[in-house]
Amino acid sequence: MISKKLSIVHCQLSIILAFLPLSVAYAQQDSTLNRTVVVENEYNPNIMDASKINVLPKVEEPAVMKKGIEYATALRPVLAWTYESMSPITREWAMNRAKRGYVRAGYGNYGNVDFKAGYLWDITGKDRLKVGVSLDGMNGKLKHWNAEDWKSRFYSTEFRLDYSHDFSKVTLNLGGGLQSQVFNYMPDSEAHTASARAADKQHHTLGDFHIGVSSRDESLPLQFTLQTGLKYFGIKYPLDYSGNASTGKEKIVHTEGDVWGKLDNEQRVGIRFEMDNLFYSSDSLMGNYTSLGLNPYYMLESDDWRVRVGAHVDWQSGEDSGIDVSPDVKAEYLFSESYVLYLHALGGRELNDYRRLNAFSPYWSLNARMPSTYVPLNATLGFKASPVNGLWFNVFGGYRISKDELFCNLVDADGYYFTHFLQDKAKTAYGGAELKYGYKDWFDASLKGTFYSWKTDNENEELYLMTKPKFELNFYAEAKVFEGLKVYLGYEYVQRKEYVIEEGNSSRDFGLGNISNLSVGASYTFLKDLSVFGRVSNLLNKQYYYEYGYPAEKLNVLAGLSLAF
C-alpha cells in the first residue's frame, strides 16, 4: 500500500499537529525520492472545512504488507480541541533530507487567515524539542437562515511545546499546549429583540499538560508505556439561557497505560488501562465523576494471521455508575501476499466531555447532563487487496450499536442560535468501498464512498437523524505537472435525510440539505525553500450547512507563501 501525502497547499491545517516537522513535504525537490519510506514525526495537514462535520463509525484498515501489524500500543498525547476530518493522503519522505523549521502564511476572502510555524530541534542525540504555533480563522459575512447576511468571526490560536529524552531503559515525554477560540453566535434575526445575554461573543480557553514514560529496552521482561496529564476547558461567557445554569469550567486528570509481555516471537499478552477524573465548577450542569477502563488482550502475529482477542471492561461513578463490557477482537487473514480478509468486533466508552462536544460544534451549549456514549458492538467485515503495484482497494460493511449516541440540531434560545445535543440509543448499518492509486511521487488519487442506515427508537426519529449522513463520497487527487509544480483536486459530497413537518395542507422541509464541496489548488516552489500556494474551495458556490446547523462559506479563495528552514 502506498502512503499518500497532502501538500502544504491546503488552506487550513490540523492545529494540534502544527509543532511537528512541518517541512517534510519540501523534500519532494529531491528527484531521487521516488520511493516510499516510513517516517517518524511526519506532518500531516488537514482540511478544516466541510470534512470536519460528521462523527461516524470508523472503519479500520488492515495492512496488506506481509509484516507484523501494529495495534496502537503507544499512548496518545493529551490533545487539544480538533475537528474531525478526512484522513490525510500523504506520501512519506526521508526525514533526514527535510528541513527542521517551517513557516506558512495565507490570506483570502471572508477574511480567512492561515498561519502555521513550527520547529523540531534535536538538542542532542537523546533530547528533542518540538515547538509549534498556529492561527486559523475568518471574519466575513455568511448567509443567515433567514437569507440575510450575518457578520461571522471565528479565530483559533494555539501554542504547543513537547520535549522528549531517551534514558538507557526508558524514554521520558512531557509537553503541553494552550489554545484560545474567539467567536460570535448567530442571532435569530438581524433585528432581534433585546437578549438576556450581554453580547453575542464567546471565548473558549483550552489547556493541557502531560508527562509520560515508555520502555525502550526490548530485553526487559515487560514492556510498558504510561502517561498522565491535566486537561482544562474554560468558557468565559456563561451559557445561561436554560434555567440560569451555565456550563462552567471542566478539569480532567487523564491517566492511561499499556503493559505487555511476549510469550514468543509471535504472541504476546497485555493489559491497557485508562482513567479519567472529571471535575466541574459548581454552576455546571455536569457533575463530577470518574471513568475507568480496562482492556486485557492477547495478540498473535504470524505470517498469515493477525489476531487480537480482548475485552473492554468499563466502570463509571456518579449518576451513571455501573460496569459495561464490550469486545475488542480483530482477526485478519493474509493470503497471496497482498490480499487480506478481516473481521473486527470492537466497542468501548466515549466520554462526552466538553472537548468532545466542542469537536461537534464550537457553538454548543448544554440544557441537560450529557451521559457517556457506550458502544456495545461495532462489527466490520471487509476485504482489502493490492492486486498490482500502486493500486489498493478495500470493500467493507458493518453494524454498530450505541447507547446515548450524540445527535444535534440548532436551537434558537436567548436571542441566538446554539447547537443543542440530543441522546438516544442508535443502530447503524454501514458499507462502502475505497480505492487508492499512486505512481511514485507523480500522482496520487483516492476515492471512498460509504452508505449509512441510522435507526433510533425515538418517536421523533426524523429530528434526531436530520444531521446524520445517508451517503458520503470523498475524492482527492494530486499530480506533479513538473518539478516544483503540483495541482490538486478534491470533492466531498454528503447526503442527509429530509426533515419534513406538515403545516396544515402543506409541508415544509427543515432539513439541512446536502453538502457538495468541490475544491482545486496548486503549489509552486520557485526557490529552494520558498513556495507559493493557492486553493479555491466550494468552487460550485453552493450554500450548505455544517452538521451543527451553522452556514459554511460559499466560494472562497486562499493564497500565501511557505518557507522551510
Report each predicted region and the residues it spans.
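N-terminal periplasmic/intermembrane-space "pro-region" immediately following the signal or transit peptide
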Residues: Y26-W93
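Outer-membrane beta-barrel translocator/receptor signature
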Residues: Y83-S85, A94-V103, Y107-W145, K151-T157
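Short sequence motifs at beta-strands and strand-loop junctions characteristic
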Residues: R97, Y107-G111, D149-Y155, A199-G207, ...
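Exposed, low-structure sequence patches enriched in small/polar residues
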Residues: A98, V103, R306, D314, ...
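Membrane-embedded beta-strands of outer-membrane beta-barrel proteins
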Residues: A117, F159-L161, F209-V213, V253-V259, ...
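Surface-exposed extracellular loop regions of Gram-negative outer-membrane beta-barrel proteins
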Residues: D122-K143, R268-L278, D283-Q316, D441-S453
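Short coil turns and loop connectors of transmembrane beta-barrels in diderm outer membranes
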Residues: G125, S168-K169, E218-L222, N265-Q267, ...
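Flexible loop and strand-edge segments within Gram-negative outer membrane beta-barrel domains
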Residues: M138-K141, W145-E158, L172-Q223, K231-E250
